[in-house]
């Protein structure tokens, strides 16, 4: 297993995509090997660090009011789907350490999300409508974020959701990945989990 090597510059998209898919494959491979106890301690530690670096790249390259490149979004989607499945493997195995990892990372509870315009080029008077789908996006455990609000123009859309049975989010704080006070959890925008949609004018 090789250490992940994400690019320093945000515009090195192809290299980033290659690394995301590589870690996704590692997640799937390690998940299968854990079932037969064929993962060395060194490989497992390197694997966890690669997951951490991938999540760190996600937070460091998620920009307020800007959509991700579609190819990058697709790569991250496959990574998060694989990580979600991996966490359930950890939870179901008779191993206290793996169970603890899954228990900390799989999140249920309230989350909040802002949608808005990152510049004044487009019409900022209209709030952005939520897109309900299975795409993993950034949410926060904190209901209010003045920093995010300061970066958006015009009308902002504020969402609240409650994750309950049968869903879980992936808590990035549990992996030690944090940006400011955002307390980030990744979770799709699933309509039945949404408890409130509010439009806030600047």
Please name every model-derived segment.
Residues 1-202:
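Mono-ADP-ribosyltransferase
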